[in-house]
Amino acid sequence: MSLRVIDKTPQGGQSTHSPHKRNPGFPLDLDWVERVRMNRSALERRAGSIGARRTVKKDYQLAWLLKAITLIDLTTLNADDTAGRVERLCAKARHPLRQDILDRLDVPELRILPGAVCVYHNFVKTAVTALEGTGIPVAAVSTAFPHGLAPLETKLREIELSVADGAQEIDIVIERGMVLRQDWQGLYDQIRAFRKACGDAHIKTILGTGELATQSNIAKASLVCMLAGADFIKTSTGKEKVNANLVTSLTMIRMIRWFAEETGIEIGYKPAGGISKAADALKYMALMKEELGNGWLQPHLFRFGASTLLTDIERQLEHGLTGHYAADYRQPMV
């Protein structure tokens, strides 16, 4: 398959917080999209094998958990969010582990920080100010999150305002109805417009996989978003009844692999919604390692969208060091 790049010099060029090459986008190849098929039973068998085949223990588990922290988008997306809550979340991002845990780990050379802090547009400026000097990017959910149902002009303006306020990553929401009625051209055109509005900011496309009916729909939507220029594909808003799971993740990861084989462009993956336990995070990391390789276990190619995962990771680290589990209140988020 031969694909030509739409923009030889992609708008925005390199990210300000990652040397990773941006996805410039490619023409919509409907023949490729229509060839996509997914076998759900095979996906379920493969996903079911991950936990049993990839277990890490003792010091290795501690190392994997430290890596997991660097892959988290610390998130607060609640209707009752306040500037104070966002500031407290950013304070946690600056110091994600208690000092006594860091001292016991004895890894002073490691700078353990989360991948980003993710907030609503109204709090982008607050987060940018609170994170100044850390190198931690601010991600803003956008385009009428979580439903994605608003006039195109409104959604584009929301992106532009978040970028102007300092967001370096924009998590946009696709219109699920476009996937359900197979309107691939419409979906492609919207993502291209969103990509242009993002400028230098990386664009993550939220599929809302729990509302797309089939794994084949999820795979096709993933491909269309990547062809349109998405830097990341993301499972969910966290507001759906069904959020991230290993089966859907395997579908999306294999589309990322296929896309990389055909285009040479590496796309990031972000599972989100319901990932609150360290053991679950390790399964997703094992899946990424087995399907895409160690190179994808980096913040510019893999993130967890999570609001409480860090709390359990801290508990597991403390248990690994002391043999005792601490109460959640010893690892407060905000």
Where are these regions (language model features)?
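Alpha/beta enzyme core
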Residues: D59-I69, D80-I112, H121-K270, S276-S307, ...
